[in-house]
Amino acid sequence: NLHYHYSSKEEIVMALWANLDTKLHHWSAVSSSLLPPHIPKIMIDQFRVIWDYRFIFSELNFLLAKDPDLRYRFVKHRDKRMEIILKFCKIMVQRNVLKATMTDGEIRRLIKTVWVISVYWLSYVFTGGEEITFDAMNEGYELVAQLIKPYLVDESILPVSLASMAITSAPTTLQITAGGTSG
């Protein structure tokens, strides 16, 4: 029983969010010299984690509206992550992966757009009555790739589709269970 360890639902959500955030941003521990070849695998891993933690996103707006302190901590944490991603993108500009002509404003807007699609894509698919499958994740990846490609120095470094790659960690269909997903 989580209520034994935490005094409120909000504390549970923040603890779960911290765990989710760590899993979502494991890529930042990967040497940036390995990217972008690993971007497709990172995206699939992120979609899987987001689906596993979908209950947080279904409760998040209600909890944030109800608790100003929780909202403050959540926004501060999210903004910190956005800054980490901004620094990462600037490194990609320095390494001639992203175009040097990108302004900070363009990078920030790209980050926000990719963030929104990455976080909410599977909810969009699920609420539309579709099954959460590798194909659904691939479509989310394709949307993100379409956003990023115009900013790449060499568009060929980012595959248009995961189907063209050997992504072995993603099953053809994810089985939806009460506790999350299984492959």
Residue ranges and their predicted role:
Residues H3-L16:
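HTH DNA-binding helix-turn interface
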Residues S58-N61, R73, A100-T101, V160-S161:
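Short, hydrophobic secondary-structure boundary micro-motifs
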Residues T127-G183:
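C-terminal peripheral helix-coil segments that are non-catalytic and often amphipathic
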Residues I44-W51, E59-A65, Q146-Y151:
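Helix-loop "lid/cap" segments that line or gate small-molecule binding pockets
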Residues W27-S31, F57-L64, N96, W121-G129:
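Secondary-structure edge/capping motif, primarily at the C-terminal ends of alpha-helices
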Residues S28-I56, K76:
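Hydrophobic alpha-helical connector segments
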Residues L70-V97, E106-S123, E139-P150:
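Amphipathic alpha-helical packing segments from all-alpha helical-bundle domains
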Residues W17-L24:
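Short, basic, alpha-helical segments at the C-terminal edge of helix-turn-helix-like DNA-binding modules
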